[in-house]
């Protein structure tokens, strides 16, 4: 306990351009379950494959990971196949299939051999649950007792950067924290440090009150491995050897975020409008990401997304949806309806204001008819008499008193020799040469 190791986890990789953050977190959560841990090359190949898969229409609705696994080419480098296989298993696990009914086999007959696998089918290898885990700040080296490594500043900065654009308690906020807890396996003291680094003092106080309530209920209910004589749950969860109790405390720490008050400002997703030339699919994707970042966890997103997909669309898409009767249809129907819509090419015409006829009244400046006062060529008269000479006919800058007087006896030009004599001298010089 308290031993500091030099090995530190790499920062959370960035999502490829065009992929939603909540989708990327699902892939990261599956990648960190691999043993040994994925390398930078594995993440690079995963990003490369997802960039190619983004061109397919599987991102419009909840992703079918089985369909995504069929898009992986044979012999694709990295561990992309294992990551997709984990997601396929998690997607199928909620609806467990019924147990197969055993068929009676006659003792005299031999069971038919299984058909050979087709060489053309590309089936990902089965996922094998790792026997040992290597998480941080709790280190689990094989064949040695668990040890604790405190938070490093770059770990906290990486987590804060991921949740900076998400609202408190939103699905993306909670999914990022779950991924960080799964990757680092923090103790109770580490979780308290993380909370103080991410949230304000008010949120820390409210979270602490809710966490104490949940811990009291859990201690009363009873937990596997919990010994009331060994101290409170928070103290036992700080022990690196008590992995089960630490997991229970981590789940309670995450559950305490569900009752925190949200942001009282107007939600940002309510002001998202479709641009005049923006594709409808891109507009719905922006709405989807904004709802993931702004809605509290557990709030149904589908009705709000359908309502905003029609009310915040531009007028042309609203007319198309209204004509087809898809104002409150499933999101897939609305996307297919507006899929072929393209903005019309509107020719920009320069509107020139016609010239008004000349006025019939005389100009206020010169008294003539036929032009406006702003077009008059007559200089503007001074507002009053000159402050120097009291003459009302000129401005101060034109006052003759400001000009220096000239002497009458001094000639303006010097006496120059006559041009005839100069010409004769030049001709004589040319003749001598």
From Swiss-Prot:
SMART domains, per the entry: ZnF_C2HC
InterPro entries for this protein: D_retro_matrix (IPR003139), Gag_p24_C (IPR045345), Primate_lentivir_Gag_pol-like (IPR050195), Retrov_capsid_C (IPR008916), Retrov_capsid_N (IPR008919), Retrovr_matrix (IPR010999), Znf_CCHC (IPR001878), Znf_CCHC_sf (IPR036875)
Signal peptide span: none
Annotated spans, Disordered: 94-121, 397-433
Pfam families: Gag_p19, Gag_p24, Gag_p24_C, zf-CCHC
A GO biological-process term: viral translational frameshifting
Transmembrane segments: none
Sequence motif PPXY motif, location on chain: 124-127
Span(s) of short sequence motif PTAP/PSAP motif: 94-97
A GO molecular function held by the record: zinc ion binding
Record has Lipoprotein as a keyword: yes
Lipidation sites (N-myristoyl glycine): 2
Keyword annotations of the record: Capsid protein, Host-virus interaction, Lipoprotein, Metal-binding, Myristate, Repeat, Ubl conjugation, Viral nucleoprotein, Virion, Zinc, Zinc-finger
One GO term describing the cellular component: viral nucleocapsid
SUPFAM superfamilies for this protein: Retroviral matrix proteins, Retrovirus capsid dimerization domain-like, Retrovirus capsid protein, N-terminal core domain, Retrovirus zinc finger-like domains
Record flagged with keyword Metal-binding: yes
Taxonomic superkingdom: Viruses
Biased composition (Basic and acidic residues): 423-433
Positions bearing the site annotation: Cleavage: 136-137, 350-351
Note: HTLV-1 lineages are divided in four clades, A (Cosmopolitan), B (Central African group), C (Melanesian group) and D (New Central African group).
Protein name (record): Gag polyprotein
Gene it is expressed from: gag
